From Swiss-Prot:
One of its GO terms (cellular component) is plasma membrane. It is an enzyme of class 7 (translocase). NDH-1 is composed of 14 different subunits. Subunits NuoB, C, D, E, F, and G constitute the peripheral sector of the complex. The gene is nuoD1. Belongs to the complex I 49 kDa subunit family. Keywords: Cell inner membrane, Cell membrane, Membrane, NAD, Quinone, Translocase, Transport, Ubiquinone. InterPro entries: NADH_Q_OxRdtase_suD, NADH_UbQ_OxRdtase_49kDa_CS, NDH1_su_D/H, NiFe-Hase_large. The keyword Membrane applies. This is NADH-quinone oxidoreductase subunit D 1. One of its GO terms (molecular function) is NAD binding. It is a peripheral membrane protein. It holds the Pfam family Complex1_49kDa. Its EC number is 7.1.1.-.
């Protein structure tokens, strides 16, 4: 009887794998079908964003944030704008805050819709993505009507938002809400009670709450394990403290709980959007949508035609940019994927001295090995989908 040396089998997952959500390369060590080790290789989409921001003025840095988590672009701009505003010490008028919150929640729905439906596709359900993309298309049109661009909006800027929303657009967003909930019910009916979907997700990728904190998780990952931690509640920014919404939490910390939380969060986002729309059409119908500080926010076209002072301000803002007082600040928002933070250091000039970006997906991806060990090879795609990783923000 000859002895056989049994050794583990190494395979590459990606970087052009349909379930890899971008340019992820995982080196998997398998013992038969069982995953022994997962090695994520990142950096294939590295563009040097943080370094590039150091060479741009504070306004020119805004578009870089759209290109991080490109599924929900405005949520990143929001964090950056908050950081700059804290350094400048300026307040945003209530209409501007409501517009920002409205579009942040649209971004949350954009992200969750894509994640829930593509994760379903990864485990074999082919209908939800088609239904989800139909709704996302309508939201992309709202992005386009506000900023002129479907994805890279550069709409939320330090000092407020780029331009005011027409009343018709606000009404259309309000009209979109209820039909969307019906479409969400359809997706819900297809997946939530589906036997195959549950077999692929229940008790897969379980993380305890202690492990969540140890790995630096945030957002849905933490809430799926039972902590009601949401920055919109825990550290309210903008006008979230005046809005009513619930925070769903899971109790098993598995893929299925995270899926359920994303489904409920979309309904809560619609609830927030309805409140914003009502206020934008009633008490906040008129009024400034961005700060009235002429040194930060460009003047109106009409003023520029009449006032030399306004013309000079406009020219200086778009050439040299405004100078931000020296200091450092960390501003975080509850992005769809978790806590998206911007640590901004200013040296008093017109360019950031350092802009550190804290992407939630980066912390989640490093736990891939911890979460997949002992699972089947087929579960790797299910866990990866449940983490909700977009490579723009991981590699930056």
């Amino acid at each position: 009887m000859t002895e056989h040396n049994v050794r583990n089998f190494n395979i590459n997952f990606g970087p052009q794998h349909p379930a890899a959500h971008g340019v992820l390369r995982l080196v998997l060590e398998l013992d038969g079908e069982i995953v022994e080790r997962v090695d994520p290789h990142i950096g294939l989409l590295h563009r040097g964003t943080e370094k590039l921001i150091e060479t741009k003025t504070y306004l020119q840095a805004v578009p870089y944030f759209d290109r991080l988590d490109y599924v929900a672009p405005m949520n990143q701009e929001h964090a950056y704008a908050l950081a700059v505003e804290r350094l400048l010490g300026i307040e945003i008028p209530i209409r501007g805050q409501l517009i920002r919150v409205l579009y942040s929640e649209i971004g949350r729905i954009l992200s969750h819709l894509l994640n829930v439906t593509t994760q379903a596709m990864d485990v074999g359900a082919l209908t939800p993505p088609l239904w989800g993309f139909e709704e996302r298309e309508k939201l992309m049109v709202f992005y386009e009507r506000a900023s002129g661009s479907r994805m890279h909006a550069a709409y939320i800027r330090p000092g407020g938002v780029h331009q005011d929303l027409p009343e018709k657009l606000v009404q259309d967003i309000g009209d979109w809400c209820d039909p969307f909930l019906k479409a969400l019910d359809d997706i819900d009916n297809l997946l939530t009670g589906n036997r195959i979907f549950k077999q692929r997700n229940v008790d897969i990728g379980v993380v305890s709450l202690e492990d969540c904190w140890a790995w630096g998780f945030s957002g849905v990952m933490v809430r799926g394990s039972g902590a009601a931690w949401d920055l919109r509640r825990a550290q309210p920014y903008e006008c979230y403290s005046d809005l009513e919404f619930d925070i769903p939490i899971g109790k098993n910390g598995d893929n299925y709980d995270r899926y359920l939380i994303r489904m409920i969060e979309m309904r809560q986002s619609v609830r927030i959007m309805k409140q914003c729309v009502n206020r934008l059409l009633s008490d906040a119908k008129t009024g400034p949508f961005s700060s009235i500080d002429g040194k930060v926010v460009p003047p109106k076209r009409g003023e520029m035609k009449r006032s030399m002072e306004a013309l000079i301000h406009h020219f200086k803002l778009y050439t040299e940019g405004y100078h931000v007082p020296a200091g450092e600040v960390y501003a975080a928002v509850e992005a769809p994927k978790g806590e998206f933070g911007v640590y901004l250091v200013s040296d008093g000039s017109n360019k950031p001295y350092r802009c550190k970006i804290r992407a939630p997906g980066y912390a989640h991806l490093q736990a891939m090995d911890f979460m997949c060990r002992g699972h089947q090879l087929a579960d790797v795609a299910a866990v990866l989908g449940s983490l909700d990783i977009v490579f723009g923000e991981v590699d930056r």
